[in-house]
Amino acid sequence: MIFSPAWRGRRYAVLGLARSGVASVRALLPGGADVVAWDADATRRAALAGAGVTFADPETIDLNGFDALVVSPGVPLNRHPVAAQARAADVPIIGDIELFAQARASLPAAKVVGVTGTNGKSTTTALVHHILRSAGIPSLMGGNIGLPILAQEPLPEGGVYVLELSSYQIDLTEKLDCEVAVLLNITPDHLDRYNNFAGYAASKARLFTMQTEGHVAVIGIGDTASAEIARSLPPERVTKIAAAGLDQSRWPALQGPHNAQNALAAIATCEVLGVSAEAIEAGLASFTGLPHRMERVGERSGVVFVNDSKATNPESVAPALAAFDRVHWIVGGKAKGGDLEACRPQFGHVVRAYTIGDATAAFAGLLRADMPVEEAHTLAAAVASAARQARPGDTVLLSPACASFDQFRDFEQRGDTFRSLVEALA
């Protein structure tokens, strides 16, 4: 567990006791902090019974005198009443990543890589972590992926913490000084949490304002917003990446143009960290990828089935379509927006689309002029139909361009269901 003696005698209110929240509480207590915590779920509160926590809803108590309000990234700061209450009391609103940043001074000297972007950050984070470990460098992966960072054991001196950071997590962080900060791309997403797209982009850019002199920014310049951020920084700090003409043939789990950008970002990051070219190449070749991200889950009669359930917006689907010549595309769920225009340049790769979930009818209407469409409604029906119609050499691709919560708990359950359906095919 990571904690800091700097928290001794301080008072913290913690709202939300899911993964990052409970990790924050369990780190603050041995640090000597006084903790008031709350979650509407009684079972989550019960899990901390006897730990020395006072249970009270921060909305119902006077926050004056607290040193910080710690919230999970899922709390919408633009509309949750507790945010206004904390600001009125001049209490900082932070998350577990900020607590980690505060704890660094008491930990063995190690570097931090922060990876953000609308798409690709999980793969890039995992890839950097894999290359470092393959090269013999102690590394931990956390943030928006894997175990909460505070729940992990500190690295020895010379190690590297590799953190996937959503815009929400950056919003809750003030002092995370990354030796390498990575921005892959910025496309419209999560706009319900920001006043406009510019606000969303500004959130991503804050990762670089927290860096001190001599630390490096690795930025993909394939979109306007990211390129503008790169231009705003001192040129000597910035390594720009653009995915074009990269030979990915030696890296089986890193196919497609989106993975070219992920690979370039990882290469640039590991070069800054002093990893040899030979070790980087070996790590790229041995990387096996992440579940639900262009994950090959089976082959039946020459037809490959690919689980890309993590692709929850059109911008992340487009490179998946581009990666295969003949695609039976399973698309739909709870749509985040009203169009699929970001995918249009790759429509020529699609043999047939199978629409599912709440977006079944709407997406069928959008696609029917460009390709054959079947309104499958359910994932099971889509997999069965695609398996019947696909021929050897085709790819059945689940890349939904939508959130999952109309029919599934999360994108992981949707991807696991797809895998099970493929495994059950005769």
Where are these regions (language model features)?
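N-terminal leader/targeting and accessory segments in enzymes
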Residues: 1-99
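Nucleotide phosphate-binding/pyrophosphate-handling subdomain across enzymes
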Residues: 2-12, 21-31, 250-350, 365
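Residues at the starts of beta-strands that form the adenosine-phosphate
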Residues: 11, 33-34, 138, 159, ...
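Residue-level signal for inorganic ion chemistry
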Residues: 16, 28, 69, 115, ...
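Short internal beta-strands
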Residues: 33-40, 217-221, 330-331, 348-359
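Short beta-strand "acidic-cap" motif of Rossmann-like dinucleotide-binding folds
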Residues: 34-39, 140-141, 162, 240, ...
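Phosphate-binding loop of NTP-binding sites
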Residues: 62-64, 73, 77-221, 225-234, ...
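C-terminal helical cap/extension that packs against the catalytic core
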Residues: 340-394
